[in-house]
């Protein structure tokens, strides 16, 4: 009955070929207009999982409550903390009034509150030590504040040397500061530029990358009509940095990360090279079609049929799901692969029949008769396989399955309506020779003669590799699907190395202050947790004691920091005299001693001597290198001595908003102990926190939960697909053995594909796991073609036109998949890589294993 229906459709369409093609073109053009008006790609990896899951609901609630899903984080970095502070302040001031691009701008971990109260967040012992050091340095600070010049700098050095002479300071204790100063002076003399940090000079420990970083959080005004909604805002930040001459004046750079820049660059990465790859793919597919069909007219018909079907499928897909995601966009590649497959199968069968009978209409009807069962069964089986993903919580693949499933039906319908009509109108010339592969006769004979060895050997090899599947890795960290070389991701990966940034933090939400304290206490006891923070963390402990120490320091330092008068800037001659005097003092102090302090003193003396002998411009440049950061440090010190009591009521509104919403929802943040870039560390961290607080959310929780969701989705969908396809096959073939002949090679190919993944170290991830349903679709189609031909009594299948069709169909599919492999997007590239691998194993199973498994056909009567 199915054969009669398909043949009748082909007869009707070829009888009214022009009308059929015209209707198809109208549909395709209308679909194209719909696509152009509604085309949208959602590049947010977080949306690949269903928002109906409990943990995703909490994730979305958190993003909405604390406005975390539409921010830009500007990371300002410079060679020294002082330059970083100056550059960050300049950028903040420059953009503070830009209401065109930004709703709000907030420095993170800096600003007036932290500048004034920063000392209160240190342990009381550290506050006592710092204020004591400041008090001891008061004479030096007074000199530098009163005379910020080379003369003042050398005066401070002279004061230090006097302390050495009096025995208050050991000469070897000055080795580090003397070397730092000498290194800076030498840098200006030798390279024309250098940087200097007073904070580094006075610090007992080396500065870290986080000391040289400042953060500004922007909430941009997004243009959702643009493909990159936040591009104007990110461009405004970069333009401001350029206008401020960040690189020249501060030696600084600004890097942008956060949800908005990541989404912008994700789209750019996906689009990068897409046009070139697309054109290249089309050209290669055209070449393969030529090799398969040897007729410009037939190729034109197949290509026109393909694009009509693709246009309709794209429009229907957008109508069904609203916007494509990073996985569902692969439907186009899938449609090209299987759409061309259906076209090639019909066209090669047509060529074979045209060789037997030179009548066009007879050849088309015979092609329809022989293709009806295999094509319709392949279309139904592949559509059923893809639609099996529809009920899963893995939304990315669920939508891919939905679009691809409908696409298979569109491809099948167009292949029995539009394609025969086009062939009827174009009327390709008759075939001069058979379209099979006679040279494969020895292979056919070998497979038939040694079928038992081949079947048993293949099954044994596949079974022997099954233990490897235990080592199959799942990498469900979505950040690994991003391009690590784009600025937003590279910046995020850098920040993730620093636990102070909280890039891999987990949060717990609550409306109760008492519960927040209990949660904080519970999480702080977990060995996997490095630190726990909440709004209460910004109210320092032991404030009375610390404020008393700061007040004592302020009484001593305020006069030094605020001298009654500042000396007039010295002339260049005065600077030279001061330098020469200090050179002499350094050499006298060092004498003939051999210790590190003496060596450093002589090195500094030599550097200052060279500076005295250089020109005025070099001395002015050197003075600026030391004085510019000095002014920053002195201003910071003045602010630090103005600390006031801090309570929850006195915290800045911007700071409070980040931890507590207007309706009283609070968050408690836990940060991981150990390597934050290690997936196992994050999994253990997430598992421990979830065990203590099951409602926790955040990046590591998403990684853990997403992995579970994806694995469950593929197990459920795989079982459903297998069941539905088996039922369809049985319904059509009516023999369990024939169903097994179709499915066993598919299962063997799937197992071998996964085993090879382990051997070559390729983990499954959010993107490339899509290869499994695609393998199901392509694999089932190829195997159905062979089984239906075998049931019809055909022998020597490798020599037949069917093998030609399958081989070149696989080649076009491989080309489509290969174009994904060349993508600059890591997720898409990994998808293409695994697709190519799965196609190789599938083709091997079809061409080599399945003929041996089937053996000689039964009598057609059976």
Feature annotation, model-predicted:
Residues 2-280:
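Membrane-proximal extracytoplasmic
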Residues 36-79, 192-206, 444, 448-453, ...:
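Solvent-exposed, non-transmembrane loop/terminal regulatory segments of multi-pass membrane proteins
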Residues 483-488, 512-568, 575, 841:
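C-terminal, active-site-flanking charged/polar segments
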């Amino acid at each position: 009955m199915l054969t009669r229906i398909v043949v009748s459709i082909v007869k009707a369409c070829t009888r009214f070929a022009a009308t059929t093609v015209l209707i198809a073109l109208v549909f395709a053009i209308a679909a194209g207009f719909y696509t152009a008006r509604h085309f949208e790609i959602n590049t947010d990896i977080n949306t690949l999982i269903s928002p109906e899951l409990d943990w995703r609901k909490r994730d979305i609630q958190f993003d909405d409550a604390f406005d975390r899903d539409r921010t830009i984080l500007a990371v300002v970095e410079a060679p020294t903390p002082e330059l970083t502070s100056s550059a960050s302040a300049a950028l903040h001031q420059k953009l503070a009034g830009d209401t065109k691009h930004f709703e709000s701008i907030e420095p993170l971990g800096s600003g007036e509150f932290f500048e004034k109260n920063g000392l209160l967040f240190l342990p009381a012992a550290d506050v006592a030590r710092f204020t004591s050091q400041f008090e001891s340095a008061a004479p030096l600070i007074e000199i530098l504040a009163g005379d910020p010049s080379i003369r003042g700098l050398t005066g401070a050095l002279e004061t230090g040397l006097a302390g050495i002479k009096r025995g208050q300071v050991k000469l070897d204790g000055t080795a580090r500061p003397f070397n730092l100063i000498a290194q800076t002076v030498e840098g200006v003399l030798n390279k024309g530029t250098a940087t200097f940090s007073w904070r580094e000079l006075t610090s007992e420990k080396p500065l870290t990358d986080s000391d040289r970083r400042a953060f500004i959080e922007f909430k941009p005004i997004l243009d959702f009509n643009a493909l990159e909604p936040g591009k104007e805002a990110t461009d405004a930040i970069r333009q401001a940095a350029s206008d401020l001459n960040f690189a020249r004046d501060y030696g600084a750079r600004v890097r942008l990360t956060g949800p908005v820049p990541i989404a912008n660059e994700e789209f750019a990465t996906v689009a990068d090279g897409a046009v070139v790859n697309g054109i290249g793919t089309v050209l290669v597919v055209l070449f393969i079609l030529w090799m398969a069909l040897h007729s410009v007219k037939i190729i034109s018909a197949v290509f026109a049929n393909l694009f009509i079907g693709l246009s309709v499928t794209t429009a229907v897909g957008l109508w069904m799901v609203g916007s494509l995601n990073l996985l569902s966009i692969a439907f186009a590649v899938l449609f090209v692969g299987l759409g061309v497959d259906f076209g090639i199968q019909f066209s090669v069968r047509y060529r074979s029949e045209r060789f037997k009978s030179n009548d066009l209409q007879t050849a088309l009807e015979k092609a329809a008769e022989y293709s009806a069962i295999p094509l319709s069964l392949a279309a139904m089986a592949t559509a059923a396989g893809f639609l099996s993903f529809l009920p899963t919580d893995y939304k990315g693949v669920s939508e891919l399955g939905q679009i691809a499933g409908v696409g298979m039906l569109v491809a099948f319908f167009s292949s029995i309506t539009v394609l025969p009509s086009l062939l009827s109108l174009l009327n390709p010339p008759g075939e001069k020779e058979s379209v099979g592969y006679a040279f494969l006769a020895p292979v056919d004979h070998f497979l038939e003669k040694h079928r038992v060895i081949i079947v048993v050997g293949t099954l044994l090899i596949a079974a022997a590799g099954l233990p490897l599947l235990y080592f199959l890795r799942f990498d469900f960290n979505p950040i690994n699907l991003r391009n690590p070389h784009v600025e937003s991701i590279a910046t995020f990966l850098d920040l993730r190395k620093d636990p102070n940034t909280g890039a891999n933090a987990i949060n717990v939400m609550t409306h109760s202050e008492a519960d927040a304290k209990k949660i904080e206490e519970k999480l702080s006891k977990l060995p996997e947790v490095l630190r726990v923070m909440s709004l209460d963390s910004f109210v320092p402990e032991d404030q009375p004691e610390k404020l008393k120490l700061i007040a004592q320091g302020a009484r001593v330092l305020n006069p030094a920091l605020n001298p009654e008068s500042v000396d007039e800037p010295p002339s260049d001659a005065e600077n030279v005299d001061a330098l020469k005097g200090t050179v002499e003092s350094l050499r006298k102090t060092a004498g003939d001693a051999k210790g590190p302090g003496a060596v450093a003193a002589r090195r500094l003396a030599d550097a200052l001597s060279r500076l005295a002998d250089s020109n005025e411009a070099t001395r002015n440049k050197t003075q600026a290198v030391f004085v510019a950061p000095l002014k920053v440090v002195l201003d910071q010190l003045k602010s630090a001595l103005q600390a006031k009591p801090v309570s929850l009521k006195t915290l800045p509104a911007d700071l409070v908003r980040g931890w507590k919403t207007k309706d009283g929802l609070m968050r408690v943040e836990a940060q991981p102990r150990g390597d934050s870039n290690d997936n196992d560390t994050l999994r253990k961290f997430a598992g421990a926190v979830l065990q203590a607080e099951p409602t926790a959310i955040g990046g590591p929780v998403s990684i853990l939960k997403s992995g579970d969701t994806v694995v469950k989705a593929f197990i459920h969908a795989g079982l459903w697909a297998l069941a539905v396809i088996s039922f369809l096959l049985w319904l059509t073939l009516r023999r369990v053995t024939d169903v097994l002949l179709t499915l066993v090679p598919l299962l063997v190919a799937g197992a071998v594909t996964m085993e090879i993944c382990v051997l070559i170290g390729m983990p499954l991830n959010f993107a490339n796991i899509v290869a499994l349903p695609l393998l199901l679709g392509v694999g089932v189609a190829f195997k159905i073609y062979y089984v239906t031909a075998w049931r019809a009594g055909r022998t020597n299948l490798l020599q037949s036109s069917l093998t030609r069709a399958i081989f070149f169909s696989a080649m076009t599919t491989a080309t489509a998949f290969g174009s994904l492999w060349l993508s600059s997007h890591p997720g898409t590239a990994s998808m293409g890589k695994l697709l190519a691998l799965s196609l190789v194993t599938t083709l091997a199973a079809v061409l080599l294993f399945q003929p041996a498994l089937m053996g000689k056909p039964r009598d057609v009567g059976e």
